[in-house]
Amino acid sequence: MSQSPPQFELLQLNMVGDVAVVQVAAHELRFPNQAQALSYELGLVSAQDWAAKTLIDLGRVQYVGSTAFAVLLGVVKKARELGHEVKFCGLTPDVRVGADIIGLDRLADVKETEAEALAAFAGPAFAS
């Protein structure tokens, strides 16, 4: 019997080749309970062998609070410890401002579109 994919509250997961594409479905990541759910769900994905390459698409998200940004940074750091790579795409202008303030692009590759991010996985690994 094949194992069914996990059901998530905040994420939609799709494999594109060997890349786990994670669409964050929430419009806002404002509250601590959302950050906790995001941490749990992204943690489940990023710890898997099949998610050695993970693309987090924030295109639907209009607002990210500081706690959720901390979660995203933690996911990148944990993935690196596992030898995995995380990239981001689709940041709206408001989310991009916050990402720039916390220095997300110093820890992970941030691309405008999913296609650009997927193409970047085929190139050399991101070096900090």
Regions found by a protein language model. Give the residues of each.
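STAS-typified acidic loop motif
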Residues: 3-40
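Charged, low-complexity, helix/coiled-coil-prone segments
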Residues: 12-22, 55-67, 121
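Residues that form or immediately flank small-molecule/cofactor binding pockets and catalytic motifs
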Residues: 18, 93, 115
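Short regulatory "switch" loops immediately downstream of catalytic or recognition motifs
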Residues: 22-26, 45, 122-123
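Amphipathic alpha-helical interaction surfaces in cytosolic regulatory modules
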Residues: 28-108
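Short acidic-hydrophobic, aromatic-tinged amphipathic segments that line or gate anion-handling sites
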Residues: 108-117
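Short, charged, intrinsically disordered terminal tails
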Residues: 116-128
